[in-house]
C-alpha cells in the first residue's frame, strides 16, 4: 500500500487519499506461466504490495504442494483495477478452479467501493470456482492517532462487506488475517512491520500459512 505514502488530505473517510499507484512495483507472471497454471488448474492470484512482497514465498509453498500459481500483484492497487485484471485474464486465458484475491488494503481510502467489486468478482468467476479473499488490517504506524483510528475503522468496514458477501456466495472463502492478528495482544507488533505490511519472515509466514490452510481446505 505504498501509494498511501503521500497524504494530501484526510479524504472523505479519514485515512487520506490514495496516490498514483500505476508506476509502483509489480509482479506479473508471463503468459507461459499463466497458461500452465490454467492448464494444471492451479491458482490465479491478484494482489497489492503485500502480494508483491509475500507472493514469491507463497508460490514456493504452493509448488511444494504440487499447486501451480500465476500472479498479478501490483503495489498500491485498490480492488477495482485488480478485478479489472481478473476480468482480462478470464477473457484471455480462462480461469482455474481457484482464485486468490489479496486486495483491499488500499481501499481504506474509499471503503464503500469494495462491495460492488466483490459482487463483480463473483460474477466473473461463476458458481463453479472458489474465491479465497484475504481480509485486511490497517493502522499505519507512520501516521498520527487520528489516521490510525480511521484506518482501523475503514478496515473493519471493508471486512464487514467481505463477511456479508460470504453469506451471499457459497463459493467465497474469507482468509481471516485480521482476526488472526487480533487474537493475541502481541501479534500486531510482531507480525506487521508498519501497521499494514507483514513482517518478514514472521508475518509473511503467518499470513501465507493462513492462505495455504484455506486452499487445502477447499
What name fits each language-model region?
Residues 74, 136, 177-179:
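Active-site loop/turn elements of alpha/beta-hydrolase fold enzymes
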Residues 141-218:
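Catalytic His-Asp segment of secreted/periplasmic serine-dependent ester chemistry enzymes
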Residues 1-45, 51, 92, 187, ...:
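N-terminal secretory targeting modules
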Residues 126-130:
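A short helix->loop->beta-strand "cap" motif at the edges of active sites that frequently abuts
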Residues 102, 134-135:
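Alpha/beta-hydrolase-fold catalytic nucleophile elbow
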Residues 31-120, 140-146, 156:
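Conserved SGNH/GDSL esterase-like catalytic core that processes O-acyl groups on lipids
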Residues 91, 119-123, 160-167:
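Surface-exposed alpha-helical segments enriched in charged/polar residues
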Amino acid at each position: 500500500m505504498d501509494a498511501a505514502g503521500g497524504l494530501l488530505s484526510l479524504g472523505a473517510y479519514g485515512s487520506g487519499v490514495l496516490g498514483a499507484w500505476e508506476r509502483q512495483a509489480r509482479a506479473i507472471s508471463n503468459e507461459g506461466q499463466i497458461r500452465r497454471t490454467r492448464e494444471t488448474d492451479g491458482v490465479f492470484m491478484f494482489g497489492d504490495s503485500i502480494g508483491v512482497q509475500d507472493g514469491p514465498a507463497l508460490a514456493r509453498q504452493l509448488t511444494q504442494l504440487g499447486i501451480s500459481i500465476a500472479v498479478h500483484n501490483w503495489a498500491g492497487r485498490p480492488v477495482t483495477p485488480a478485478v479489472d485484471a481478473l476480468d482480462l485474464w478470464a477473457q484471455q486465458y480462462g480461469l482455474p478452479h481457484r482464485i486468490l484475491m489479496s486486495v483491499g488494503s488500499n481501499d481504506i481510502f474509499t471503503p464503500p467501493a469494495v462491495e460492488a467489486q466483490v459482487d463483480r468478482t463473483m460474477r466473473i468467476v461463476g458458481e463453479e470456482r472458489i474465491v479465497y479473499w484475504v481480509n485486511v488490517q490497517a493502522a499505519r504506524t507512520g501516521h498520527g492517532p487520528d489516521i490510525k483510528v480511521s484506518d482501523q475503522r475503514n478496515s473493519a468496514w471493508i471486512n464487514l462487506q467481505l463477511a456479508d458477501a460470504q453469506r451471499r456466495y457459497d463459493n467465497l472463502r474469507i482468509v481471516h488475517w485480521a482476526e488472526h492478528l487480533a487474537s493475541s495482544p502481541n501479534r500486531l507488533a510482531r507480525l506487521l512491520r508498519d501497521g499494514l505490511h507483514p513482517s518478514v519472515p514472521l508475518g509473511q509466514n503467518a499470513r501465507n500459512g493462513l492462505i495455504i490452510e484455506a486452499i487445502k481446505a477447499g
